[in-house]
A protein has these predicted regions:
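Histidine-centered active-site microenvironments of extracellular/periplasmic hydrolases
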Residues: 348-379
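C-terminal tail/sorting-segment detector
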Residues: 501, 505, 511, 515, ...
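Short, glycine-anchored, charge-dense loop/turn motifs used at functional sites
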Residues: 488-495, 522
Length: 541
């Protein structure tokens, strides 16, 4: 059989035993979970940074003297004679962006996103007993299962399991639009499940549309031989895959990118990730109902020539490409009006060791930093700053559950807050009860949400009595309901209940006393039923 595109139709082929004479489309195949956003237009973009991103030279503790001491050649220095090569402070914190994330980037890059409330920085992400093999650690991150035991085979991703659970009739009923879409390569384990692949991978969209799918030009075979049966069966599978070609082609032709945002540059300084994000933006603009997109950027295995004393090198170039891609996408999404429907998350299999090596590079390490972007993220820094006094026997930053963030908490937050799942749903998908890190707000309120779209996602904090220790939380409910407001610190640890009561419809202002809490960023989470809204509080003493 001739295969004429880069389409990976594994969602179909993986379900070989059950695919005969089955319908392709379904009006509403969701049944197993009560995930509110899965059945609306909420979208997740995951950017995989393969190679192990150096978090310490991405979000930088410049004011810690030990940082420069252990990285004399590759550190980013505040006194660089070239102002464009100096680190850029994040809000009023003591952490800094690498200048490549800001300077020379579309609309000031990550600084512009942070100032606009569209970027969350999540420090110290990782897992206990880290595995420093690229492939095993990548499998751990993509599977959502924390196991470094090589005997434990990891064959499916947390996204694949999420959709497997949400689409109980799959593969007997196939959604009209692909659930997941990967740009380039063969389909990632992230999008695979026990029921088969829950998405497809394509290369260049123009070629994908031009080539027209995967089915053969040859007719069905006659006869009842085993060969004929298998041939005709495989051909029918590919023909069903062609239906996805048609909906992608329609979205591609209907969609657009905002004039003046040049996603077309596929090489050079901006690189292929920019092109991938432009493709995703255009498909969303054109009405494709895919729920999860996966983009990729490699090259982060920076053992040599990571960066020189002038901040030139492989790592700054990659960070510049990442910042351009995300910033251009968000600009396009805002201008086209779909920004409130989309969040994005970066993932990288591990970080780098604090000490530079002898080749102006760094070796495999443990924890790193991840980014979440979108209009529905909590724009702040989550997690504790790196502690150079607490290194393990390999000289890596030690993973401490009291200070670091289990990477699965990022996924649990997506499952529960973005896709509306319950704690039990999250447990089923991640195979463990994982407390979500509250870095997201719910999608724009549905008609069933009793919290009005008031201020910052239905919940707003104001410091009305001119004291850093006190203020008010404001919100409005459109019907009588029970409301709980909880407080979490920047690590996502529960810090106390602020309110727990049944209230009547209308506007409410709840006094908040923060005098017993230390300085820092806190998250207030308002919940009622399955709906959650969050806002941040900054305490300065």
């Amino acid at each position: 059989m001739k295969r004429r595109t880069l389409l990976k139709a594994g969602a179909l082929a993986g379900a070989a035993a059950s695919f005969r004479s089955i319908p392709l489309f379904a009006q509403n195949p969701i049944g197993a979970l009560g995930l509110n956003a899965i059945d609306n237009d909420a979208i997740l973009i995951i950017i995989q940074m393969f190679g192990g991103n150096d978090g310490l030279n991405t979000i930088i503790p410049v004011d810690d003297p030990r940082y420069v001491q252990i990285r004399p050649n590759i550190s980013v220095k505040k006194d660089n004679v070239d102002a464009t090569k100096r680190p850029v402070r994040i809000l009023s914190s003591d952490m800094y962006f690498h200048p490549a994330l800001v300077n020379g980037v579309h609309k000031n890059g990550f600084l512009g996103l942070m100032d606009a409330g569209r970027l969350a920085v999540i420090q110290g992400t990782g897992y206990e007993n880290p595995n420093l093999s690229h492939f095993r650690s990548t499998d751990i991150w993509l599977s959502g299962l924390n196991t470094s035991d090589p005997a434990n085979r990891l064959n499916e991703g947390w996204v694949g399991r999420m959709f497997e659970k949400n689409y109980p009739e799959f593969p007997m009923v196939i959604p009209e639009h692909p659930l997941c879409l990967q740009l380039g390569g063969s389909l990632s384990m992230l999008l695979q499940s026990d029921k088969g692949d829950m998405g497809l991978a394509i290369g260049d969209v123009d070629s994908f549309v031009k080539d027209g799918g995967t089915s053969s030009d040859s007719p069905m075979m006659g006869g009842t031989s085993n060969y004929a049966n298998e041939y005709n069966y495989i051909r029918s599978i590919a023909a069903k895959g062609d239906a996805y070609n048609k909906v992608i082609e329609e979205a591609w032709k209907k969609g657009t990118n905002t004039t003046g945002i040049d996603f077309a540059i596929a090489n050079g300084a901006k690189g292929s990730l920019v092109r991938q994000m432009g493709i995703i933006s255009r498909l969303i603009s054109g009405g494709l109902k895919t729920k999860v997109y996966l983009a990729n950027i490699g090259g982060f295995d920076t053992h040599v020539q990571q960066q020189d004393t002038s901040n030139n090198g492989q790592h700054p170039a990659l960070l510049n490409q990442l910042a351009n891609a995300v910033s251009m996408f968000m600009d396009d999404a805002v201008q086209q009006g779909f920004a409130n429907r989309v969040i994005g998350l970066t993932v990288s299999e591990f970080g780098r060791r604090p000490y530079e090596n002898g080749s102006n590079g760094t070796d495999h390490g443990t924890t790193s930093v991840q980014f979440a972007f979108g209009t529905r993220v909590q724009a702040n820094i989550f997690g504790a700053n790196p502690d150079f006094s607490d290194l393990d026997r390999n000289g890596d930053l030690a993973f401490d559950m009291n200070r670091n963030i289990d990477y699965r908490r990022l996924y649990s937050e997506i499952i529960q807050t973005w896709f509306g799942g319950s704690t039990d749903d999250s447990k089923d998908i991640l195979k463990d009860r994982v407390v979500p890190l509250p870095y997201l707000q719910s999608p724009i309120a549905s008609l069933n949400d009793p919290i009005m779209n008031y201020g910052n996602g239905g919940l707003r904090f104001s410091n009305d009595i001119a004291s850093s220790n006190s203020g008010y939380l404001h919100f409005e409910v459109k019907k009588n309901c029970h409301v709980t407001i909880r407080l979490y610190d920047s690590l996502g640890k529960f810090a106390g209940n602020l309110f727990d009561s049944y209230i009547i419809a209308g506007n409410h202002s709840i006094p908040v006393d923060m005098s017993v809490h230390a300085s820092g960023m806190y998250i207030c989470e308002l919940s009622t039923g399955n709906f959650r809204h969050t806002t941040s509080i900054i305490v300065r003493k």
